[in-house]
């Protein structure tokens, strides 16, 4: 249980391998194809940023399976000199993005999306969701970074 709150592996094995392990668990428990790739020169990422990105990956993938009935999810992380770009793309059912609630409804629907947006906003970063019925979903996160050379 403690591991799920804050994975110790960030410090031990790094962010990328931690993501791979999380996606392995998802693959094994849901019979889904999950791919993870990185581009750019990898650098250390602040632990708050790492944890937030991991939570966004977990929530977006969970939504892809539960609501989108996706069979394949592609996660990519692009290390750029001044930002990190995370993209999560699925082949699920897709949906009308105008139907995303701005705030959580009484039945807690939309809670995961609201939490993802709030977590990214606090870093500060930007989160966008693009989707159309029948065309899957793309969640994109851009976070500015101040890496030390």
Give the positions of each predicted feature:
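Coiled-coil dimerization/phosphotransfer module
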Residues: 1-149
């Amino acid at each position: 249980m403690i591991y799920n709150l804050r994975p110790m592996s960030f410090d031990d094995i790094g962010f990328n391998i931690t993501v791979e392990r999380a996606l392995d668990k998802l693959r094994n428990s849901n019979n889904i194809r999950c791919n993870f790739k990185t581009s750019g020169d990898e650098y250390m990422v602040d632990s708050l940023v790492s944890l937030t990105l991991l939570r966004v990956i977990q929530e977006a993938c969970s939504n892809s399976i539960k609501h989108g009935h996706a069979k394949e999810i592609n996660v990519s992380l692009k290390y750029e000199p001044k930002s990190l770009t995370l993209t999560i793309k699925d082949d699920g059912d897709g949906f009308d993005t105008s139907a995303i609630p701005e705030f959580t409804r009484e039945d807690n629907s939309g809670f995961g999306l609201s939490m993802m947006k709030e977590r990214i906003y606090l870093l500060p970063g930007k989160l966008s969701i693009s989707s159309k019925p029948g065309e899957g979903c793309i969640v994109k996160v851009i976070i500015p970074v101040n890496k030390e050379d």
